[in-house]
Amino acid sequence: MDNLFTLDCGEILLREFRIEDVDAIYELTSQPEVYEFLPDWRSTREQRLDWVTNYEIPDNKEFLANVPSIGERWMKLGIVLKETDEFIGFCNTGIKEELSGPNREVAYSISKHYRNKGYTTQAVKGLVNYLFANTDVEQLNAVVLPRNLASNKVLAKCGFHLTGNIEIENQLHYHYTLVKKELMK
């Protein structure tokens, strides 16, 4: 656990994934409440172990090594309870290819057992603040299915503005943006 990138976000921390998180990530992404909105995250445990080991952990190291000029790199952080270090969700940033530039997005999910406690809002605000303060990012995006009411509320609480609709994989999504200069006013 030493030397892991960590952001203090109030009651929760955002921190780099570790191998020990694989079972928690697998359990989280196996919840129907999660894969309904993030089907690409559904996997076998073996796939998840491969992804965490060979992609997500190395991608995070590469992202952090290139701050402030992060380019098209991804960072995937676990949401953990500050008091117990229990892994309860994730909050990520990367490029959303379906959007025209600037197309850096934030994406997140939290276990059904920890919803409606403000943890996701704390995580998104923490990641947004980090990106705007420490990287060359000037605008962030999020795409959300209209029926994902909780996620739409999180984005509104974090200052994102609904800017339009976009079709992704034959489904209508709301497109939200947050511009650094507007947030810093």
Feature map (PLM): residue ranges:
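Conserved GNAT acetyl-CoA-binding A-motif
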Residues: 134-143
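Conserved beta-strand-loop-alpha-helix junction that forms the acyl-donor binding cleft
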Residues: 70-72, 142-152
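GNAT-family acyltransferases
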Residues: 1-113, 134, 161-163, 168-185
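Conserved acetyl-CoA-binding loop-helix of GNAT-fold acetyltransferases
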Residues: 108, 116-130, 152-157
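Proline- and acidic/polar-enriched loop/turn elements at helix boundaries
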Residues: 41, 126, 143-144, 167
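Conserved phosphate-binding and hydrolysis motifs of nucleotide-dependent enzymes
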Residues: 89, 148, 157-159
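Conserved G/P- and acidic residue-centered "switch" motifs that form tight phosphate/ATP-binding loops
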Residues: 85, 118, 148
